[in-house]
């Protein structure tokens, strides 16, 4: 596709008759599958049957998508109240990660209770997978030319030594923008490496998951400050408020669980 003489990538991957298949969905799906592979591999090593995470994903992913969409729609209600038919249209984005995380955690707690396994054990195993999915998923935002930052010059982007396909895709309606999707994606990939390394440290059960929440939230807080499409509540960026809250809650949970003797088991224990 050409836009203002700057070559750009088409958000539609393939056309199946009258039905377009968007890169956004393909990329999100890829993130889910790779995350599932990573979790089942580690789960088997720690005595968790392979079908446990397959079953969890089949339940948690639809619920997470539902919560992610509900979260987004709630904070953009002024638009969706006037365009109710668009509420279910997620083909071109409009999923809020924090909403999806809330849905996934609720599902995980109920699933673990029903299966008679430790939620914290499942959460620890899944933590790198969740972050990997988020790192990959941000490239769906890239294809949709959304979740970007403020205006910049092409010279600025070239100064970051980015490949042309990224620079060109950040050219929207005659203006270049901060590739905030890339900043967050790289931060998340670094977090995946950190979490995989911390598996060998044998942290107390639950603390790998809290480390994920802290790491992701720190990166999201700073990246969100660069974005121009933040969900707002008055003067506050919702994602920044949530990020601060998750860091504080995670630290409190780590301290309280240790003091109350609820974190005696280690990551590698059955």
Swiss-Prot record:
The record ties this protein, via Pfam families, to: LGT
Q: What is its EC number?
A: 2.5.1.145
Q: What is its main location?
A: membrane
Per its UniProt entry, what is the enzyme's top EC class, as one word?
Answer: transferase
Write out the residues that bind a 1,2-diacyl-sn-glycero-3-phospho-(1'-sn-glycerol): 138
Kindly give the InterPro entries that the UniProt entry links to this protein: Lgt
Q: Which GO terms describe its molecular function?
A: phosphatidylglycerol-prolipoprotein diacylglyceryl transferase activity
Report the pathway entry: Protein modification; lipoprotein biosynthesis (diacylglyceryl transfer)
The Gene Ontology biological process annotation of the record reads: lipoprotein biosynthetic process
Q: Which residues span the membrane? A: 19-39, 56-76, 92-112, 116-136, 178-198, 206-226, 236-256
Subcellular location per the Swiss-Prot or TrEMBL entry: Cell membrane
Q: Which family does it belong to?
A: Belongs to the Lgt family.
Q: What is this protein called?
A: Phosphatidylglycerol--prolipoprotein diacylglyceryl transferase 1
- State the organism named in the record: Bacillus cereus (strain ATCC 10987 / NRS 248)
């Amino acid at each position: 596709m050409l836009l203002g003489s700057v070559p750009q990538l088409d958000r539609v991957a393939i056309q199946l008759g009258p039905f377009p298949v968007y890169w956004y969905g393909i990329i999100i799906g890829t993130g889910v599958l790779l995350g599932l592979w990573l979790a089942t591999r580690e789960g088997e090593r720690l005595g968790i049957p392979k079908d446990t995470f397959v079953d969890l994903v089949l339940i948690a992913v639809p619920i997470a998508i539902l919560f992610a969409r509900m979260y987004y729609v709630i904070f953009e209600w002024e638009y969706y109240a006037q365009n109710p038919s668009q509420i279910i249209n997620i083909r071109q984005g409009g999923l809020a990660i924090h909403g999806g995380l809330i849905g996934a955690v609720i599902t995980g707690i109920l699933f673990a209770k029903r299966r008679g396994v430790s939620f914290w054990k499942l959460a620890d195993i899944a933590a790198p997978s969740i972050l990997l999915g988020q790192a990959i998923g941000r490239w769906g935002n890239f294809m949709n030319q959304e979740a970007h930052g403020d205006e910049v010059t092409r010279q600025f982007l070239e100064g970051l030594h980015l490949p042309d396909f990224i620079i060109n895709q950040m050219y929207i309606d005659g203006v270049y923008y901060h590739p905030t999707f890339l900043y967050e994606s790289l931060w998340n990939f670094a977090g995946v490496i950190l979490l995989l390394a911390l598996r060998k440290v044998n942290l107390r059960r639950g603390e790998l998951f809290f480390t994920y929440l802290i790491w992701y939230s720190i990166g999201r807080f700073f990246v969100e400050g660069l974005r121009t499409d933040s969900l707002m509540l008055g003067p506050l960026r919702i994602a920044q408020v949530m990020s601060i809250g998750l860091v504080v809650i995670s630290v409190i949970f780590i301290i309280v669980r240790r003091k109350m003797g609820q974190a005696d088991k280690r990551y590698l224990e059955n």
